[in-house]
Amino acid sequence: MTEKRMKILHVLTDRNIGGAGRWLLYYLKYHNREKFAVKVVLPHDSLQVAAVQALDVPVLAMEEMEDKSFDRKAFKALAKIFRAERPDIVHTHASMTARMAARRARVPYIFNTK
């Protein structure tokens, strides 16, 4: 019997590759692909997009995302993504907007790291 993979969405608002971005790339390179189905939500113009795709990890690139404390447009777009993707976990990297959108979309587990 095949075990269902846990769906995890990581959300980064950074356009450059900083500390969180480097950590995420390391994680994506070595995570267990048999147990975890991982996707990453990024601003469409982030330098991270190509780096994540090079690791054969799906990217959901958003035009609406800004790197600020609360972003109404991004909130609506993220909630829509979370409802469509139905992740088991949303892991945000310092984004209050993503945490609030995940809660609105009733994501079971929401983690945040800075």
What kind of region is each of these model predictions?
Residues 81-88:
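Glycine-rich phosphate-binding loop signature in dinucleotide/nucleotide-binding domains
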Residues 10-18, 22-73:
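N-terminal strand-loop element at the rim of the active site
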Residues 105-110:
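A short helix->loop->beta-strand "cap" motif at the edges of active sites that frequently abuts
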Residues 91-97, 114:
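Short His-centered aromatic/hydrophobic patch
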Residues 4-8:
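Extreme N-terminal starter segment of soluble prokaryotic enzymes
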Residues 52-53, 99-104:
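Short amphipathic alpha-helical segments
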Residues 69, 97-99:
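Short glycine-rich, flexible loops that bind phosphorylated cofactors or substrates
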Residues 75-79, 99:
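Short hydrophobic/charged patches on amphipathic alpha-helices used for structural packing
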